[in-house]
A protein has these predicted regions:
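Switch/connector loops and helix/strand junctions flanking conserved nucleotide-binding motifs
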Residues: 9-13, 38-41, 78-86, 107, ...
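Inter-lobe coupling linker of SF2 helicases/translocases
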Residues: 1-30, 37, 42-67, 71-74, ...
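Walker B beta-strand of ABC/ABC-like P-loop ATPase nucleotide-binding domains
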Residues: 30-31, 458
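Conserved RecA-like P-loop NTPase helicase motor core
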Residues: 75, 353, 398, 402-517
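Walker B catalytic acidic pair
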Residues: 33-34, 478
Length: 749
């Protein structure tokens, strides 16, 4: 087992493996966990030697023996289908001809994804009420579904809970309603509040990060060749503007996280400004003119921001102060320094004792320990986006918990070795997580002689993905990540199938303000700092908060997070891969045929009767077969030559044949756990049909089902005229009942 980051290392030991002696190209199978980290592909830069995706492709996939790839991800698609294509390209070594020859598609995989993205972009522009999953499914090409069915298997929490018997695989714990905390900054009298600090922050120019803005126009050419960006589409000025924007947003994030982290960042920026003003003063006095462009500290950014190209591409650039309007720059630097000084004074009195947010957390911990929600389970997992905040919490929480309850605490941040109050325990990541979640991490096997037990774990997002910590039943988001998906990923550490806990609790700490105020504030900062020269790689959000519709969407997301724990596929504005593929049904069918090999010999027209539900009303689901196998009515039916239609008792179409995924899901749900005829419903059906001798109503509904196929085909023909990929209007013609045979039907009563 190695880590994604090991791809960029040239030597050393990782997980007990000597990387100097590792033959990367010698593996027949590579399993990539959290594969969405590779979804951006090789990037658009000419110089991509440091790109982890390229390293994986060159060192592991293309080199040595033929390598098969299995990729695991909860979020394979962010808001572009290209994300999925980039991950698939790992499996076919970036050579599309390799996969094109294996797929039963008419177009190449590149064309398929290009058209899918085009359809998705058009769908995104629809009004929210029109932007349904069904609307997107109807515009996607048949070949796209063929690709998905060939290479993906998808399951979600909701899907497993709804369609699978959890008796065999274990159930998910019940999610309690999230607890929302909104502590003020401090309880000191006449102390400042969030809004007062925000007003001061809005006055900052943060020009310390944009020295290129002050280079004389006549001198700019001198730096065009010296900058780090030969062949790269991110200019030095664009890079500086990107860092400036991120730092502006980050000051808000740091304040939301903790007064301690905010104060550290203020100090770091002030120190940079002071050094720069001193350098300018020395130049005026002694003529020493070289100036390094200053980098922001890694500690000041959360994990998502720290991974943007502003930090990973290039190196420092030296600027000659003689080439700059340094006097203007110095004036603006001094103005920022004064604001930072004022902010520092504003929060100077907020020590841990008067830090209301910290004191609220300690009270919350006490309540959980004294009143567990599952038996005697005292475990609590606390997340922060920033390592500085996590360190601050550890220093205060560990002492409090040890002195009051005799329990042990640990810290993992990913930037430094972990810490723990357990004596004699080396605080490596594996040791800490094993002692925190001993059952899920098999502590009895890995550390049989250890009695160490950790009840409180404080962590950054370095463990928000890929870790099973389900021994814990209580998770605290000490700060609300600006990317809402992160919040759900964090909760996924304890919200897992087979958990020994009956209930799990999520606690979110929000800034002390109204949600509308909070959203508008974030928008003001993002809008103010949006620079057109910046490349798209600077965005740390799933959505662009400048568009009014997206602001409303962000508000709705955060509103939901206050009321419920949201599934990850529901939090994305786009489409879930769960809505698209049929692969799981094929696997179910193959499994069924192993124990029922005589399916081919079953007579046509078999039926059964099942109870209706709120979501599946009374009606009939027909399974038909087109007797002319060569005709795929509109080249869109993914289960051709079979056609499924769900018709209501009144002849209304509940679900047409273009959505077989929904129909198959409905059939599975209606029949799940039922292996014998259900007397309560079949008795009534037999009475109505004279024990099957009078099937007039069924015949009429069957005729309506076939009419619906023809009507849907005509609608689809018209639609196809407006989308890329050719029209289906001229492909075939069907006349009615004589084109189909009835395979079976499911009566819903």
């Amino acid at each position: 087992v190695l880590f994604h980051t090991d791809l960029s290392r040239t030597g050393g030991i990782s997980n007990g493996i000597d990387l100097d002696r590792l033959n990367w190209g010698n593996y027949d199978l590579v399993v990539i966990d959290e594969s969405h980290n590779f979804r951006n592909g090789a990037g658009t830069h000419a110089n991509t030697t440091e790109n982890r995706y390229v390293k994986l492709m060159e060192k592991v996939i293309r080199t040595g023996v033929k390598t098969k790839v299995l990729m695991l991800s909860a979020t394979p698609v962010n808001n572009r289908f290209v994300d999925l294509r980039n991950q698939l390209a790992i499996a076919y070594e970036g050579d599309s001809e390799q996969i094109d020859s294996k797929l039963a598609t008419k177009k190449s995989i590149d064309d398929i994804f290009r058209q899918a993205q085009k359809a998705y972009n058009a769908w995104c522009k629809l009004e929210p009420k029109e932007r349904t999953t069904d609307a997107l499914l109807r515009t996607l090409d048949f070949d796209f579904f063929e690709v998905l069915d060939s290479v993906t298997i998808a399951r979600s929490r909701k899907h497993i809970s709804k369609y699978y018997s959890t008796a065999e695989i274990g159930k998910f714990p019940e999610r309690l309603k999230p607890i929302s905390m909104r502590p003020s900054l401090t309880n000191l009298k006449s102390a400042i509040n969030y809004n007062q600090i925000y007003e001061e922050l809005m006055k900052l120019t943060l020009c310390i990060y944009t020295p290129s803005n002050y280079i004389f126009p006549s001198k700019l050419d001198k730096y065009m060749d010296l900058t780090h960006n030969k062949g790269i589409n991110l200019t030095q000025r664009g890079r500086e503007q990107g860092i400036r924007r991120l730092m502006s947003i980050n000051l808000l994030k740091r304040l939301e996280s903790s007064v301690f982290s905010f104060n550290l960042t203020l100090s770091r920026i002030r120190e940079l400004i002071t050094k720069t003003i001193d350098a300018i003063n020395r130049f005026e006095k002694y003529g020493i003119s070289d100036l390094d462009t200053y980098e922001a500290s890694d500690h000041d950014f959360d994990m998502d921001d720290g991974n943007t190209d502003f930090f990973t591409v290039g190196k420092k650039v030296k600027i000659d102060l003689a080439d700059m309007d340094y006097r203007t720059w110095r004036e603006e630097l001094q103005a920022d320094a004064d604001i930072l000084e004022l902010l520092t004074l504003m929060i100077a009195d907020i020590t841990p004792e008067y830090d209301t947010k910290l004191q609220t957390l300690l009270a919350l911990i006490s309540k959980k320990i004294e009143h567990p929600i599952n038996g005697d389970n005292k475990k609590i997992l606390i997340f922060s986006a920033f390592s500085d905040t996590a360190e601050y919490l550890y220093e205060n929480v560990s002492v409090f918990v040890k002195e009051k309850y005799g329990l042990d605490t640990a810290l993992v941040t990913g930037t430094v070795d972990g810490k723990t109050t357990v004596k004699g325990l080396k605080a490596t990541l594996n040791n800490v997580l094993t002692c925190f979640s001993p059952i899920s991490k098999s502590k009895a096997v890995l550390m049989p002689s250890s009695t160490a037990n950790i009840d409180i774990l404080i962590a950054t997002d370095c463990i928000s993905e890929g870790q099973n910590l389900q021994d814990c039943d209580y998770l605290v988001n000490y700060d609300i990540h600006w990317n809402p998906v992160r919040i759900i990923q964090r909760f996924g550490r304890i919200d897992r199938i087979g958990s020994k806990n009956e209930y799990i609790q999520l606690v979110n700490f929000w800034p002390d303000m109204d949600l509308d105020e909070y959203i508008n504030l974030k928008n003001r900062v993002e809008t103010r700092m949006k620079i057109s020269v910046m490349t798209a790689t600077g965005d740390d959000d799933l959505i662009n908060a400048e568009e009014k519709g997206d602001l409303e969407y962000r508000k709705a997301q955060l509103q939901r997070l206050q009321e419920e724990v949201v599934d990850i596929e529901d939090m994305s504005e786009g489409i879930s891969i769960m809505d698209l593929g049929l692969n799981e049904f094929r696997l179910d069918l193959l499994e069924y045929l192993k124990t029922h090999p005589d399916m081919e010999r079953k007579p046509r027209g078999l039926h059964t009767v099942v109870p209706a539900t709120e979501e599946q009303p009374e009606g009939v689901i027909f399974v038909l077969r087109n007797v002319n196998n060569s005709v795929n009515i509109d080249n869109q039916n993914r289960i051709h030559p079979f056609y499924m239609v769900y018709i209501g008792r009144e002849g209304n179409v509940i679900c047409d044949y273009l959505n077989p995924k929904k129909l198959l899901d409905d059939v599975r749900l209606l029949c799940r756990g039922k292996s014998e005829p259900i007397k309560a419903v079949y008795t009534k059906f037999n009475e109505e049909t004279d024990d099957g001798r009078n099937m007039a109503e069924m015949s009429e509904l069957l005729s309506m089902a076939i009419d619906s196929i023809i009507d849907t085909k005509e609608e689809s023909d018209i639609d196809s005229l407006f989308f890329a990929g050719g029209t289906s209007a001229l492909m075939s013609d069907i006349s009615g009942l004589s084109d189909f045979e009835l395979i079976c039907f499911l009566v819903v009563k």
